[in-house]
Amino acid sequence: MTSPCSFPLKPTISPIIHETPDTNIPPPLPLNPPDLALPSPPCSLHTSISSPLPPPPPPPAPPPPPPPPPLPSAVEPVLPHVYGLKNSQLLKEALEKAGPAPKGKEDVKRLLKLHKDRFRSDLQWILFCADLPSCIQEGPQCGLVALWMAEALLSTPDSVSLERLVQVAKERGYTAQGEMFSVADMAKLAQETLDCQAELLCGGLGGPNRERVLQHLITGHPLLIPYDEDFNHEPCQKKGHKAHWAVSAGVLIGVQNVPSPGYIEDSELPGLFHPVPGAPHQPPSFPEESSPGALFLLSKQGKSWHYQLWDYSQVRESNLQLTDFSPARAADGQVYVVPAGGVEAGLCGQALLLRPQEGSH
């Protein structure tokens, strides 16, 4: 190592020339040993010509090797389907951070643990849920994404891609970019592409339709619902300006007493019950429509791969007030397909009950 104030280690000494000595010249005086010492250099590092340079410091130890990757599980996790993933780095990064989509029961139990104060402690709860795949939309394709997710519960002979749903919807004139502002058009698209039964429900999710919806869900069939989406994806009331689609695949029902037999209490959450798979069970009594906080829909939508639990009355009220086309969409310069009569005629108070064809397995 060379200091900024370093100098040559060997002093500059004139070379010694060996000549024949002159006997008349007296011998030189002996050198005084202290005169052999070199003056100290004008810097903080003192170096003697008789001492070697100190060895350089050892190199730093290499970092420890990374931990080995976890052993693969017996069942490979199913990652959410992301439409447009190949073209979106943002979606790729989000998907890598999020990991596999959780199963329905486990995701609902996570919600119950996080928001336990939201659910009435004076009731026991029965959870009916079916596992849906997750699909993240790209652009205004929330309705078609919801339909694609619902296909998993419809025993469709051949899987239909989201790209195929978009293509057919455009060819039939139901959409320009993937948007769906007509529940009736969605029903026709589902019948054609998924070969399923599609029942158009009018008049809202309350009144006599309420029991039909609940019976449909506890049987394990999907329900497509248009609603106004809040910032957290939950239902709100924006007069249709935030119109969005979700697919419901289950329901959480609060009851005074759990019917027996056919239900088993959850091992982690006391007071939560599940129907025993494959065992006959008596359907529970549905809570009165006027009973607050006793009924929640289990839903998914195209902006998250997690299930969400929504208060049934909030979904009902949001679905009933879809009346206007968004002014922001009207001014964005894009083309949208809106049915005659507008958003109110196409979405307000409507939902879609989907079932497999008779004889399907």
Swiss-Prot record:
Entry-linked InterPro entries: ACTMAP
Pro residues bias (residue ranges): 24-33, 52-72
Effect of gene knockout: Animals are alive, but suffer from muscle weakness. Absence of cytoplasmic actin processing in intestine and kidney. Accumulation of immature alpha-skeletal muscle (Acta1), alpha-cardiac muscle (Actc1), and alpha-smooth muscle (Actc2) actin with N-terminal acetylated cysteine. Undetectable actin maturation and accumulation of immature actin in acetylated and methionated state in intestine and kidney, however no effect on the total levels of actin.
Pfam families registered for this protein in UniProt: ACTMAP-like_C
One GO process term, biological-process aspect: protein processing
Iron-sulfur among keywords: no
Coiled coil stretches, renumbered: none
Top-level lineage group: Eukaryota
Record region (Disordered): 1-75
UniProt GO cellular component terms: cytoplasm
Subcellular location field: Cytoplasm
Keywords assigned by UniProt, alphabetized: Aminopeptidase, Cytoplasm, Hydrolase, Protease
SUPFAM superfamilies per the UniProt record, alphabetical: Formin homology 2 domain (FH2 domain)
Molecular-function GO terms, alphabetical: cysteine-type aminopeptidase activity; initiator methionyl aminopeptidase activity
Enzyme class: hydrolase
Region annotation Peptidase C39-like: where it falls in the sequence: 134-254
EC number: 3.4.11.-
Catalytic residues as annotated in Swiss-Prot or TrEMBL: 142
Subunit structure: Interacts (via N-terminus) with PFN2 isoforms 1/IIa and 2/IIb; the interactions may facilitate efficient cleavage of the acetylated N-terminus of immature actin. Interacts with PFN1.
Comment text on domains: The N-terminal proline-rich disordered region contributes to the interaction with PFN2.
Function: Actin maturation protease that specifically mediates the cleavage of immature acetylated N-terminal actin, thereby contributing to actin maturation. Cleaves N-terminal acetylated methionine of immature cytoplasmic beta- and gamma-actins Actb and Actg1 after translation. Cleaves N-terminal acetylated cysteine of muscle alpha-actins Acta1, Actc1 and Acta2 after canonical removal of N-terminal methionine.
UniProt family annotation: Belongs to the ACTMAP family.
Name assigned to this protein: Actin maturation protease
Annotated source species: Mus musculus
